[in-house]
Regions:
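An interfacial alpha-helical scaffold signature
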Residues: 1-140
């Protein structure tokens, strides 16, 4: 029996289908409790494209798909349950490098990346913060 998708998984599906509202997606991500795998007390992340991605999952089923390939094998994968807002507002800035949030990366056709840009992460760690400020300075 397949469990129903979370509200965030629904927003991701809408966005991937081209019918979602990006602001609603970001809002849902911020309100959602996400499961972040941990190893030795450190949150799981991966580097790709010059960005460190904190990997998080919308539910235990999505986390289990990931654990099949990346888990410790003979024992359950530890994880932390964190609000999306806490991940992008506190965890990401604490990494000290460009970082974003990758959700449900083991779900075929169901993943979503929240890059380190203004409107997702705090301006102080957003990679586009200077460009946004320049745009505002010209009366846009």
């Amino acid at each position: 029996v397949e469990q129903p998708r979370t509200a965030l998984a629904e927003r991701i599906a809408e966005q991937r289908a081209g019918v979602g509202d990006p602001r609603a997606l970001i809002g849902e991500m911020r309100r959602s409790v996400l499961l972040v795998p941990s190893i030795d007390g450190r949150l799981w992340s991966a580097h790709s494209g010059g960005v460190r991605w904190v990997c998080a999952f919308t539910d235990e089923t999505a986390l289990a798909r990931f654990a099949l390939h990346h888990g410790p094998g003979d024992r359950p994968m530890d994880y932390a349950a964190l609000l999306g807002a806490r991940i992008v507002d506190e965890v990401v800035p604490g990494l000290g490098e460009p970082a974003g949030l990758a959700v449900d990366i083991a779900s075929e056709g169901g993943s979503m990346f929240f890059p380190p840009i203004t409107g997702i992460v705090p301006d102080g760690v957003a990679v586009d913060a200077d460009a946004v400020e320049e745009g505002r300075g010209r009366g846009r």
